[in-house]
Each structure stands twice: as C-alpha cells, then as structure tokens.
C-alpha cells in the first residue's frame, strides 16, 4: 500500500487553497439559501476557483484510503443528483459542517438543474473539513455516464468541456466504499467477486469505472427480493443480489449492515433482507417526476441508526 505522505508534504498540498478564498466560495454557495425557489438563479463561481476545488480535493482523496474507515457519530446521505436546494435543506436539517460529520454515497451530478453548485459545495467542504466530511463515488461520477445525463451539458453551457474533463480527473480519485465500525457503505452494493475488504483496499487510483467486475458492482449492483444468489440487473450493468447473498456476506466479514443508495425509494430510506441492507436516497421529488421523500441516516456513538426525512414538496 502507498505510504502516507510525510506531514510537510501533506501540509503543502492542502495549503494549495487560501482559506479566505475557500471561505468566500462557501459563503457564496450558502447564500443561495436566500434566493426564491425556482428563480433559476445560479451561484457565480469562476472557472479558476472550480479548477482549484478539483485539484485540491483530488489530492485529499488520494491521501485518504479508497476504503474509508470512519467513526460514528456521522450522518449518511444518498443520491443528490444536482438538486442543490435540497442539499442545502439537508444541511439545514442535519447541521452545516463541522456541526456534524457527513458521508455522502455518490451521484452528486446529472439529472438535476444545479450539478455544478452541488459538486462545488461538496468539494469545498471536503477541503475545509477533510477529517469530518467524506464523499464516495457513485456510478454518475464517471465520464461515460455524466457525458449523457446532464453534467457534461451543464459544464459546456456554463463554462467549457475542459472543465468537465477536470472534474473527470477528480472523480477518478474518489473512494469507493466506507466502513463505519460494522456498517459497510457504498453507492450500489456488493459483488460476486468481493470476498474480503482487502480486495477494495488494494485497488489503485486514478480509476475509470470498468464495465464489469468488483468496482463496477460496488457502484451499480442492486438488492432484489425476487432473486436467490445473484441475478441479472435490468440496468444492463452488474447484478442483483438476494437476501441470502447479503446474510452470507455479512456473516463471513463480521458485519451488521450494508448501507447504499442508487435507487429511488418512496420514503427516502428502505430496508431489505431483514434490515441487513438499507437504501438511502436524498433527492426528494426526484427529477420533479417522483413523489418520493429524501432521507438522511444518522448513526450515533452507539451505532444506533435513525432517519431524518425531507418531505416531498406539496407544489405540483
């Protein structure tokens, strides 16, 4: 495994962003709270500022492991998909960092109207609070996917394709899983190739998401009540896994729970396999097409899990 960088080197890399510049970016992004919903207003960030967010956060991702080992208390959020106003609502509810520790499970971009604000806000917090704020990679943090589902077009419309490529380089360095005591977190799910967590630890970055195999499954697989063992996935990528597969995996690896995102669920969270898997989805009224709530899972010091719900808005 790569050695941890020497403290002075680490200092050098994380010092690459002036605290005053970072705080000003965060201030502008938070001020968006005061704008009228649906006003179409955007936060103004310069291309240089965004490039810096990508470069500095990328260094931090690479200094931290690909399988994060985190401690409770922590709040876990699922897909955001460019729904920036809802991301701000989540923080209003759970506390803006560093009042609470956070782990996000991926899918920051695509589909929603404000992928740029969403990802820039999250990267800014990652830089400001690197030991309290964590971001995993979702299947949409991948060039071949976000080229199609909106992020590329947003970057091109508001800036240029070059900036989209810089985000791609940053996304290729994101961690893919996190362990919080006996809770394993990832965007999608488990993999038929995953026997031991050391397999994840040994993956090197930067990394393109392959079309199949362990990393692909961690970001793409889904639980299914209709299958025993492993089944085909309607997405045309990866697999579905049954409750029996989950029980066997958890027992073998001495774990209690798999926490994942990746699927819209009506109440914002949903258990599967006798509460051995939980899906957390944090974009309410997803795409304006669903009536789902969004949720955030809080894990306290004693590893008790509770849920905070963002109700879908009444307006049609």
Swiss-Prot record:
Gene this protein is translated from: PP1
EC identifiers of the protein: 3.1.3.16
Required cofactor names: Mn(2+)
Residues binding Mn(2+) 2: 107, 139, 187, 262
Keyword Methyltransferase: no
Binding residue positions for Mn(2+) 1: 79, 81, 107
Catalytic reaction equation(s): O-phospho-L-seryl-[protein] + H2O = L-seryl-[protein] + phosphate; O-phospho-L-threonyl-[protein] + H2O = L-threonyl-[protein] + phosphate
Cofactor note: Binds 2 manganese ions per subunit.
Keyword flag Hydrolase: yes
Record-linked Pfam families: Metallophos (PF00149), STPPase_N (PF16891)
Keywords: Hydrolase, Manganese, Metal-binding, Protein phosphatase
CDD domains for the chain: MPP_PP1_PPKL
Cellular component terms (Gene Ontology): cytoplasm; nucleus
Protein name per the record: Serine/threonine-protein phosphatase PP1
GO terms for MF: metal ion binding; protein serine/threonine phosphatase activity
SUPFAM superfamilies: Metallo-dependent phosphatases (SSF56300)
Domain of life of the organism encoding this protein: Eukaryota
Similarity comment: family membership: Belongs to the PPP phosphatase family. PP-1 subfamily.
Positions of the catalytic residues: 140 (proton donor)
């Amino acid at each position: 495994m790569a050695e941890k960088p020497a403290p002075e080197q680490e200092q050098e890399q994380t010092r690459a962003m002036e605290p005053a510049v970072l705080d000003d970016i965060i201030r502008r992004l938070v001020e968006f709270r005061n704008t009228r919903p649906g006003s179409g207003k955007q936060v103004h960030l310069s291309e240089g500022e965004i490039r810096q967010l990508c470069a500095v956060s990328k260094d931090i991702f690479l200094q931290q492991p690909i399988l994060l080992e985190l401690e409770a208390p922590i709040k876990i959020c699922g897909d955001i998909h460019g729904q920036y106003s809802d991301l701000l609502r989540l923080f209003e509810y759970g506390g803006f960092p560093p009042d609470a520790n956070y782990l996000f499970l991926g899918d920051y971009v695509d589909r929603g109207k404000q992928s740029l604000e969403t990802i820039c806000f999250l990267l800014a917090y990652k830089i400001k609070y690197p030991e309290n704020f964590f971001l995993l990679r979702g299947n949409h943090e991948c060039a071949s996917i976000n080229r199609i589902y909106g992020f590329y077009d947003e970057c091109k419309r508001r800036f240029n394709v070059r900036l989209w490529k810089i985000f791609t380089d940053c996304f290729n360095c994101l961690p893919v899983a996190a362990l919080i005591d006996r809770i394993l977190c990832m965007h999608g799910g488990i993999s038929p190739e995953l026997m031991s967590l050391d397999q994840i630890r040994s993956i090197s970055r930067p990394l393109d998401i392959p079309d199949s195999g362990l990393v692909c499954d961690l970001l793409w697989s889904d639980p299914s009540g209709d299958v025993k063992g492993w089944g085909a996935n309607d997405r045309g990528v990866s697999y579905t896994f049954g409750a029996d597969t989950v029980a066997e995996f958890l027992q073998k690896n001495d774990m209690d729970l798999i926490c994942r995102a990746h699927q819209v669920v009506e109440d914002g969270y949903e258990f599967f396999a006798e509460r051995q898997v939980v899906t957390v989805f944090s974009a309410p009224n997803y795409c304006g097409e669903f009536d789902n709530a969004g949720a955030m899972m809080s894990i306290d010091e004693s590893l008790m899990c509770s849920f905070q719900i963002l109700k879908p808005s009444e307006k049609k």
